[in-house]
Every structure is written in structure tokens, then in C-alpha cells.
């Protein structure tokens, strides 16, 4: 039997997440983009024979990161992925990130994720050693260490790494993926144009990491419509 995969569409309902460069026009927030991408990933995984457990399939807030992880554990998933997008007040911030459990030793699926994302975005380094604001090393080390209690400076709703840690503590390997910065015009444009390929790449990464061959569903061929009696061929010459 093929693996059971958990997909968490970040945020939802009253938890909006970050805004995008186009929020003022389309009214969409991170919660909308995570759900859209998660549903496409789910579809691709199901097409390849995998069972999928979703944290949500509509615009609802399914609970804290702890409750989301609990659902994955109750459904005994083999791997869980939390889908997010980044944002920052200065539009220059850009790139993708993949966060993994502190104790994870095998990074096969993560390396595949990076291979997909680097085709479209700059890969950000969470372990970079500097005082730069974007280097999350201190938080990353503390929050993803399964032996460390929850960092109390963060509330349940903002402790996004808590999904990874709580899955890990329940025996589930889980990743958190930040696709790109919705607040960066270039990232946003690239994502919108390539979201289906990105979703496919993520699904393919999971399928292949579990030792299966990814199968692309062939589009159904359209049956030519029979012409009605009064319709003429394009080359018909009227007399």
C-alpha cells in the first residue's frame, strides 16, 4: 500500500496570513494561496495512488498548529507538509525556504523540494550565520529541536514551526515550506504563472521520495462535436 500523506494548507478563516502585492485589488491573502496550492498537490498525489489527509479544504481555520498536527497523527500519516507563503513590509525580500525537523537525518524529499523551487525562486538559507534579520538560525534551532519546549515568546497561532515539532513528537516526519514572498512583485508574478508546475513538482518530490514513479495524468481527448444541420464547414463557399 502506498504512503498516506498529510497536507496542511496554512492559515484559513480568520487567520489571513500575509498579504500579496495584489491584495488591494483581488482581496486575496496567504490563506487563499495556501489552500489553492494544497488542493492541487492533493489532486496530483491522489492521481498517483496516494491517500491524502488535508487539514482543510475550504476557507476555515482548522485550529492551532498543535491541533493540525494532532489530526495528522490521528490519521497516521507517513509524512506531513505544511504549505505557507512568506511576506515582509519591504518588497525586496524574496525567495523560498524549506524547514525540516531538527533531528531529521534523511533529507531526500527536502532536496527534491529545493530542486523544484530553485527553478523559479532564490533559495534562502535558514542556517546562514550572520546578524541579518532574515537569518532565522536562533529561532530555527530552538523551535525545531524536539527536546525543547515551546518557545513562549510565540503564541499558538504564530508558532508555525510548532506543526513540524508536534508532528515529530508524534512520530511523523514533517516539513514546512515557504513557497515565495507574496509581497515581492517578481516572486508573486512567477508563482502565479507557474503554480501548477510548482504543485506538480512538490507532489512529484513526495511520490519519488517514497520510491514510486510519478505518473502524469493524461488529459482526456475531446470528442469532436457533431455539426448541426445548419452549420457549414469553414471552407464552404456560399452560392
Give residue ranges: language-model regions.
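Active-site-proximal helix/loop segments of hydrolytic enzymes
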Residues: 2-3, 28, 32-239
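Short glycine-rich His-centered loop
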Residues: 2-27
Amino acid at each position: 500500500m502506498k504512503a498516506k500523506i498529510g497536507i496542511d494548507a496554512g492559515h484559513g478563516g480568520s487567520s489571513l496570513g500575509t498579504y500579496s502585492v495584489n491584495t488591494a485589488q483581488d482581496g486575496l491573502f496567504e490563506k487563499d494561496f495556501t489552500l489553492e496550492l494544497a488542493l492541487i498537490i492533493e489532486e496530483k498525489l491522489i492521481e498517483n495512488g496516494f491517500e491524502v489527509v488535508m487539514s482543510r479544504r475550504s476557507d476555515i481555520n482548522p485550529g492551532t498548529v498543535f491541533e493540525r498536527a494532532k489530526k495528522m497523527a490521528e490519521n497516521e500519516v507517513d509524512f506531513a507538509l505544511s504549505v505557507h507563503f512568506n511576506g515582509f513590509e519591504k518588497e525586496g525580500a524574496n525567495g523560498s525556504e524549506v524547514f525540516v525537523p531538527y533531528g531529521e537525518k534523511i533529507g531526500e524529499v527536502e532536496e527534491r523540494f529545493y530542486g523544484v523551487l530553485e527553478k523559479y525562486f532564490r533559495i534562502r538559507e535558514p542556517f546562514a550565520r550572520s546578524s541579518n534579520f532574515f537569518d532565522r538560525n536562533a529561532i530555527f534551532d530552538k523551535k525545531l529541536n524536539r527536546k525543547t519546549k515551546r518557545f513562549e515568546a510565540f503564541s499558538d497561532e504564530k508558532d508555525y514551526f510548532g506543526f513540524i515539532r508536534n508532528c515529530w513528537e508524534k512520530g511523523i516526519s514533517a516539513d514546512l515550506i515557504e513557497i515565495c514572498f507574496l509581497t515581492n512583485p517578481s516572486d508573486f508574478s512567477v508563482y502565479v504563472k507557474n503554480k501548477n508546475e510548482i504543485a506538480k513538482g512538490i507532489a512529484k518530490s513526495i511520490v519519488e521520495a517514497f520510491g514510486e514513479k510519478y505518473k502524469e495524468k493524461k488529459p482526456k481527448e475531446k470528442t469532436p462535436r457533431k455539426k448541426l444541420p445548419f452549420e457549414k464547414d469553414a471552407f464552404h463557399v456560399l452560392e
